[in-house]
Amino acid sequence: MRAESPGDVQQTIRVARDRGMRLSVLGGGHDWAGRAVCDGGLVIDMSGMRSVTVDSGARVATVGGGVIAADLIDAVAPYGLVAATGNCGGVGITGLTLGGGYGPLNGRFGLASDNLLGAEVVLADGRIVKADATHEPELFWALRGGGGNFGVVTSMRVQLHPLDRLIGGMILFPWSQGATVWRGLDEVLSTAPDEWTVLSGLMSGPDGNPAVFLAPAWSGDLLSGQAAVDALTKLGTPLSGQVAPMTYREWLSLFDAWDVRGQCWAINTRTIAGYTPEVIDALLEIGRTLTPPRSGISIHHCHGASTLVAPDQTAFANRRPHFVVEIIAGWEGGDSVRHRAWADAASAALAPHALPGGYANLLVPGDHEQIANAYGENAIRLVAAKKHYDPDGVFTAIPLPGVSEGKRSNAVHRR
């Protein structure tokens, strides 16, 4: 069903329930596990709901349920504003926000979910409600990190922030220097200000061999930022390094190659406290067995403003400084076995050094151990909200601890 209005979504939910059909929701189309589609069921396609309305004075944008990061950033850029998004322009804003939302501006402006001001939601019983600090406050709390478990978000109001340009780019180092680079990066990030976020990881380099990448994003004073960025290039001998003032949209385009749509992917995830010697050793072994050319690892840094929110203020509970390791296996056609095996082995190598739980938007379906610990002490409250707003389990693609995944439904917004 190609939805063009909340009424279309409402009607589709009612049809699915009346006929006992599985239901899924396609938002931005960036979910690696394909949870936005379901064979033999109904798919609510939100891709036609991509409107963005900007109130530049209030610094607020109202976005449709199918809006992707590129849509939002393009709409707000003429006003010298940005929004907290993921690391790729193709990521859906709604699904990203509902699961938490890591990105290059988290240190300064918080997670995407921290910037959610309100939402219009079609509930499992077909009612259309508004959720914000004064209307359905418990639903509003659950939407900020609890995933697509409570209804279909047809529009959201998100906070915007002034930012014309940042300093960013991509620096590649040879794999032989991986240990030195990550040790140095750990020291740099230990005193990093909120304006300073560095995405790191591994990918296939220009020669086809594994390489370490650093993707800095400095959103503060450009003059001060240049010195910080220059220090990164001295952590090793770069294979390449193009770092300069750029727009936020240009920074997001650095990761267009990892847009999951139309490709074959498997993703695992682990959460770590930092680049300890044990973690670095595990990363080096993971890189040694990397399956090129699309596979890699992306390590997201949660710090600054993202850690200043009380754990119980929103459903997203992990508020201590940490890193999310996104293990990405990519391939073409039927060549899946060795790539999936690499991702599984990478996850296993990091497991002894990982924190409990994981990032809901990236968790492997059926990984009950990480799911059980993903929400911390917020899990009990989330399950109660689930029973109140969706007692029959219509929306269950990102399961909550102790909640059955259900037989009829498999709905969640894609990232």
Which role fits each region the language model picked out?
Residues 1-415:
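Soluble FAD-dependent oxygen oxidases
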